[in-house]
Amino acid sequence: FSIKTKYSELKRAFRMIAPASLSSGMIQINVLTDLFFASKIVGAAAALSYANFLVQAPLGIVSNSILIPLLPVFVSLRSRENNFKLIKKIHQGLILSTSSMIFLGSIFISLSTPIVILIYERGSFNQNAVDVVSQLLIAYGIGMPFYLCRDLLVRVFYGIEDAKTPFRVSTIAILLNLFFDWFLIGGSSPWGELSPLHLGVNGLVFSTTFVNLFACIFLLFELNNKLDNLLL
């Protein structure tokens, strides 16, 4: 009986780990897609890396401080009789993550140029580079709330032992990211004409924002269905 129980628990854990690992790996496909389109613009890949570094450092600190304490709470409240408590914690998490990201995003938007100058402007990193990275930082700031909301909702699904839904969302996100990268970057390239829009490298950041927005909406509706339409 003990061996059978352990095997059952191991099988259940594998059903969670396999889709979750694949979902995490799919994020790198989106990064490679962005770099492919960035290669069509001189200096775009480097600018994306510089701006992304400025975003990921504070984002990682804030996300860990919010998501790590909430995950065990979601797990402990996953039983059906605790739906109302689970929904309350989800609402609290969404409010906290959104408000913190709006605050962080507003800093990036309002202080983008001073931040880039302070961190990067030296040597061959001239004013033109400052302007490009500052614009990217503003674009990242606009989409900040959707980054953490998506990650929070994914943790909720893991907490209720559903890793397949985030996996499906990650799969669809790859296709959406490919389309939005093509549609928003605009201009011409050695590979032919792109879409009529001309957002340039900023379009790659807005593409990520739209993909994260889609993920948030899709996950919210799926979660609402799982919680008997009590979430929304």
Predicted regions and their residues:
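Membrane-interface helix-loop junctions in multi-pass transport and translocation proteins
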Residues: 1, 164, 174-217
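Interhelical loop/hinge segments that connect adjacent transmembrane helices in multipass membrane
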Residues: 1-27, 225-232
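Interfacial transmembrane-helix starts/ends
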Residues: 14, 49, 70, 82-111, ...
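Interfacial/gating helices of multi-pass transporter permease domains
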Residues: 16, 36-59, 127-134
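Residue-level recognition of pore/gate-forming positions within transmembrane alpha-helices
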Residues: 28, 53-56, 92, 105, ...
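Helix-loop junctions and terminal segments of transmembrane helices
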Residues: 63-82, 153-154
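Interfacial segments at transmembrane-helix termini and the short loops linking adjacent helices
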Residues: 109-143, 194-198
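Membrane-interface junctions at transmembrane-helix termini in multi-pass inner-membrane proteins
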Residues: 142-172, 182-183
